[in-house]
């Protein structure tokens, strides 16, 4: 129950002053007793850390924690290791997982629910706390119940800027050793406020911090040297040299000119939001996520992208790894300056206890202008998107996986004690702790504080996931800066100690890399960058370097800067095409060549394409003539055709149109021919898209007894179309799917079989019947398969998006009608309802018998739900057709790819589809309808989709291979899979399903074939004649 504040204090009449004061005092006393949350934190949970009195906490804030005097000699023996582990658990450990979610007055419900879900998955009991406007979590609120009764505090972000932080420095010093919060006030306040950021820049003008001058101009301040920058050894002007950038270029981009240079969004070619997780201060530890959000101010377009793709493709840096390192150095310099600024600030207590496990996920807004050098525009104290009030599906998906990655990184299950002991022994034996970087020899004896710091760092390195190490940094510029800061003025008052901690972490990092070299050669870098050998060489265009085609597209421009001409006489054509992943175009790109072809392997399911033109009034559109200038495409198996429209909008040419065409062939799964000695392997779900995380994924060995059982001739017929089963494929090894013969794959239900009818049996079963289909393109694919099975040919085909009748099926003995639903291209207010569409189809198909001679097939990829089944029953009852055969084709996999033009489902949303699918199956059976469970069949083969933006099509109607139009690619067509040709005892019957290649058209797609055959078996299982 959420405890609400009581407001009995509002004046209804004019009482005496004494009564007013009494009532006010009662209200204030009540507020000190009540925690506004989803439950009260009044009882300490079992095993909680003993309560600490307010006096002790206040004293701690003034004096700080006394340093732990206990010392451990890590000899490597088991007894010493166990002793260290026990001491660590006593000193820092917690016996439970209890989290407080602090909800500010203006919060996001989506963010709240997301944190609840993620923390619950990590085993936390979640308590929601709220407080009055602008109050924050003060000492009194956190102290209620028991300060030791919780382990984790999460301050949710506020949609509106508030003056009071969620938790202050003064409160942080009262936290127990085991407690952590997602706030670091020491750097949050100076970094995430413009006035604080400006003060940092003014404090250290010699550093030429890469911060936009507009930050200080907004505050009415001038960027003049400050007399308080006494931490540096010298005040001589410095030019920082990240990587191999030229001195001239750095001078142009980093020198501050406050009265002349004002960065505005429209002046920047692109703004990148980089997400940085800070896990410690003094020593500073920080990590950067491999994903960022890009905002294109001129085009007002926002999209999420891997940082690797950003630097390779969108920023067009000649050396992407170097550009990334420069950005990391810029962020690292600012973080280090903020840490030192906080320690030497005159605001607040100068000595206070640090929260050893606290962390903060920051968002850095980084602008890139014409010089392609990073400039920090703003730092946000939480995950930030361009428009929080209008977050789209992509934003919500990005927030979800960023938070998932963050908490998986922070709360790994593995212990790091054993690897810590091994690393430490390696360092000590190699005399690393006695090197020149240390001011005195470091004894092998370490305190718990030192052990905890190094162990936490090792644990972080072992659970990086999508994060990469940002700080401590091996960059010479950053290391030089650390010497500048800490050799002269050490914040903790012990010269050299902070620097010693940094060196120890860097040495640990080096040893960790060495130990993991065999399993992960470059654990903290992008493996795909292959230009490292050329970093030390003068920068030249990559298209001028031999044998570098695999690193970046060959067609890239020589210059990093993008220029276009306003001259009307400049020809309008494509200057270059850039793609991710890199595509080898055939022929090589040339502006005058309009058609290109390339091939990609099976695992490449999407491609991002962008185009550059030399003329400013020459506009490029993908997909269609009004499409975007760059976009992500899904790549179905086989041929994918992409059109690139180039329009000259200059007045002299009157919007002339030029079309370029790109054909991308995506290969089938790598497959080996079937050998005599093979292993039967089965799978239900792919490990790349887990629907049931608790169940196995990928290929699993199948026993010979199981194979013998399903090959028995007396195996019973399946009683329904949703029997549980699995895909079975012969392989040399179930641990390597490249050793399988995927041509022989079959869908096999457990303990039963679906009968595959011969052509005469099927013609007899469907003779005299009317079959009505209503649904989307997935239903249409099954309909075309049925027509081809009955006629052995498909004479006509079109992508029907309305209502169509087929009278020439089965020699005219079977009538088939089809209605496309839903008509998503029509405005919702004008779009026909499902009830209207169904009534229209029934009326157009009359006369209809109220028997099994009339078959209604309803299905769609993801729009169908149980409410539609209620509507079907209502309409059939009204039309006196309750006795007809109704077959429900359930949901299917799709919309799982982040591509332009369609919505994108997160993994959790795809998992929710499974639950909805179960509801549809249950509701259909209650109404007496037949079902075909297409979701279970498609989810394990989600990568095997064919053409279409949705990634949901498992069928394709193609012209016959005899067509002259397809002669040049006939050997590249995907194979026509025969359902269960090897494993099933139906093999002889199934030979009759081989395609008649004299047909003008053919429906291909093995998964659609399986679903269609199950549907046909249900049509003919119990032919109703009532």
Curated annotation (Swiss-Prot):
Q: Which residues form the signal peptide?
A: 1-34
- Write down what this protein is called: Cadherin-like and PC-esterase domain-containing protein 1
What Pfam families does the entry give? Cadherin-like, NXPE4_C
Task: Please give the PANTHER family that the UniProt record associates with this protein.
Answer: CADHERIN-LIKE AND PC-ESTERASE DOMAIN-CONTAINING PROTEIN 1 (PTHR14776:SF1)
Q: Which family does it belong to?
A: Belongs to the PC-esterase family.
Write down the glycosylated positions.
Answer: 251, 404, 413, 737, 791, 985
Coiled coil, from the record: none
